[in-house]
Amino acid sequence: MSQLQVRHDWKREEIEALFALPMNDLLFKAHSIHREVYDPNEVQISRLLSIKTGACPEDCKYCPQSARYDTGLEKERLLAMETVLTEARSAKAAGASRFCMGAAWRNPKEKDMPYLKQMVQEVKALGMETCMTLGMLSEDQANDLASAGLDYYNHNLDTSPEYYGDVITTRTYQNRLDTLTNVRASGMKVCSGGIVGMGEKATDRAGLLQQLANLPQHPDSVPINMLVKVAGTPFEKLDDLDPLEFVRTIAVARILMPLSRVRLSAGRENMSDELQAMCFFAGANSIFYGCKLLTTPNPEESDDMGLFRRLGLRPEQGAAAKLEEESAVLAKAAAYQDKSSAQFYDAGAL
């Protein structure tokens, strides 16, 4: 009998009851639902590139890109088009089907919108899906990016409404929900999830998933991040989250949002192969591939390739053979060359 339910009226106590299930029961329920919708041995692969790094005015306590914290991160200007395209070609050659571009902004400036739209069009011309995360979007900005062909827009809710004020004060929870509304209204697909391990309680993890699952339409992609503690940020000395609580979060996300891609996102660098295998069984079916997520370490491509082989997993769209090849096209986003080179885009030159 099918356990799949697509609902938008989940109550907090229902979700907390799922979290409280014995692990075997929870995993069985989540995996059964997962198999009803998806091939359980296929994983969607995305590559994430920081197109503008650091100097963000926001005060997210987990983020090394905030200008408010001394994390040793050097700010970078918006990347030049050819640099972005070289990275996109490398991602495609390595088996990624989606290329995600992130900028450390509160929101994009109007002067940069034509360039961002061109970036979307150029990457799409390579035959890849496109995603951006640029901060808050107005209705007009969302429509502009949609008109350029942007497939996905990422804007995370981060945590529950109740715990949110302990994480960030420079934008409201409603600001985030408004951006998701603008993205969905534009026709783009929504990518939205959160971060666990930020000192929140179990009820906050339930609250985050409740907010996502009770949106008028579930996010198409739900990234679940494990906090990566960065020296210099207010959250650098928080206690580690029990890894099994992370697995539970993945499983409950799969149950609540059965048609969504659930992405095993930041924090994989610190996860054992066994923990990742449990997450895939619990319903995770998307990852970021490559050694860095914006400014955060990620497993090497060869490590992911080996894990996929051992687990019998394969990338979506049959790019398995290309995972054999080492990506030798360009140094990764952290190894940017001289800031004065043509690697960076100059908005003033438009």
Curated annotation (Swiss-Prot):
Transmembrane segments: none annotated. [2Fe-2S] cluster binds at residues 100, 131, 191, 263. GO terms for molecular function: 2 iron, 2 sulfur cluster binding; 4 iron, 4 sulfur cluster binding; biotin synthase activity; iron ion binding. It catalyses: (4R,5S)-dethiobiotin + (sulfur carrier)-SH + 2 reduced [2Fe-2S]-[ferredoxin] + 2 S-adenosyl-L-methionine = (sulfur carrier)-H + biotin + 2 5'-deoxyadenosine + 2 L-methionine + 2 oxidized [2Fe-2S]-[ferredoxin]. SMART domains: BATS, Elp3. Pathway: Cofactor biosynthesis; biotin biosynthesis; biotin from 7,8-diaminononanoate: step 2/2. [4Fe-4S] cluster binds at residues 56, 60, 63. Binds 1 [4Fe-4S] cluster. The cluster is coordinated with 3 cysteines and an exchangeable S-adenosyl-L-methionine. Binds 1 [2Fe-2S] cluster. The cluster is coordinated with 3 cysteines and 1 arginine. Residues 41-268 form the Radical SAM core domain. One of its GO terms (biological process) is biotin biosynthetic process. SUPFAM superfamilies: Radical SAM enzymes (SSF102114). Its cofactor is [4Fe-4S] cluster; [2Fe-2S] cluster. Signal peptide: none annotated. Keywords: 2Fe-2S, 4Fe-4S, Biotin biosynthesis, Iron, Iron-sulfur, Metal-binding, S-adenosyl-L-methionine, Transferase. Its EC number is 2.8.1.6. InterPro entries: Aldolase_TIM, BATS_dom, Biotin_synth/BioAB, Biotin_synthase, Elp3/MiaA/NifB-like_rSAM, rSAM. PROSITE patterns: RADICAL_SAM. Homodimer. Belongs to the radical SAM superfamily. Biotin synthase family. Catalyzes the conversion of dethiobiotin (DTB) to biotin by the insertion of a sulfur atom into dethiobiotin via a radical-based mechanism. This is Biotin synthase.
